[in-house]
Curated annotation (Swiss-Prot):
Name under which the protein is recorded: Uncharacterized protein aq_2087
Domain of life: Bacteria
TM ranges: 26-48, 72-91, 104-121, 125-147
Source species: Aquifex aeolicus (strain VF5)
InterPro entries to which the protein is assigned, alphabetical: P_starv_induced_PsiE-like
GO cellular component term, pick one: plasma membrane
Mode of membrane association: Multi-pass membrane protein
Matching Pfam families: PsiE (PF06146)
Assigned keywords, A-Z: Cell membrane, Membrane, Transmembrane, Transmembrane helix
Cell compartment(s), UniProt: Cell membrane
Chief subcellular location: membrane
Entry keyword annotation includes Cell membrane: yes
Length: 183
């Protein structure tokens, strides 16, 4: 029973949260250079593909080789945009210690648009592919709009005048939470 009291004490919980925060900061310190290196490598790949494309163009390469180089360049540029969106999500996780739904949806939209561009560009699509991607894009877009609308409503609600009753309820809830943490 003494162990249970110790691990549920306020001091122990604060210590554990502090250890967790230090661990997350350590991981962030390790991950940020890796993220930067990944972006630099992606940029280098794009420049290499661009050089390859220009080389094929200037030396009058076979149309098939020229087409492959161009498709590879487009694919890697679109991959770079997806990487940027995913890195924005990761940086937000490090900065705010939470995943923002809005940014996940933005990354999903960028990924779906990338896939649509690639299948249309490579002429390997069917009616059902486009219908499926269209439905997915519509769902992601509606979710994004609804999230934005609900956030605006939340802001309006937060900045309104608080009644005396609401203020006293908030104060009593704060006191109740403090009491629970002390136990």
């Amino acid at each position: 029973m003494k162990l249970l009291e110790k691990i549920t004490s306020y001091e122990f919980i604060c210590k554990m949260v502090d250890i967790y925060n230090k661990f997350v900061n350590f991981v962030a310190i390790l991950m940020i250079p890796i993220l930067m290196l990944t972006l630099l490598i992606a940029i280098a790949i794009i420049f290499y593909d661009l050089r390859l494309f220009v080389d094929y163009f200037l030396h009058g390469a076979v149309a098939e080789e020229y087409d492959k180089a161009f498709k590879l360049l487009v694919r890697n540029i679109l991959n770079f945009f997806v990487l940027i969106e995913l890195f924005k999500v990761f940086i937000d996780v490090l900065e705010f210690r939470r995943i923002r739904k809005r940014q996940i949806i933005e990354a999903g939209i960028v990924f779906v648009v990338r896939e649509i561009i690639l299948i249309v560009f490579e002429h390997r699509f069917t009616f059902w592919d486009l219908l499926g991607f269209g439905a997915l894009l519509l769902a992601l877009g509606l979710t994004y709009v609804l999230l934005e609308k609900s956030y605006m409503e939340y802001l309006k609600f937060e900045h309104r005048e608080i009644t005396k009753r609401e203020r006293s309820e908030r104060e009593s809830l704060k006191e109740q939470r403090k009491g629970e943490l002390k136990r």
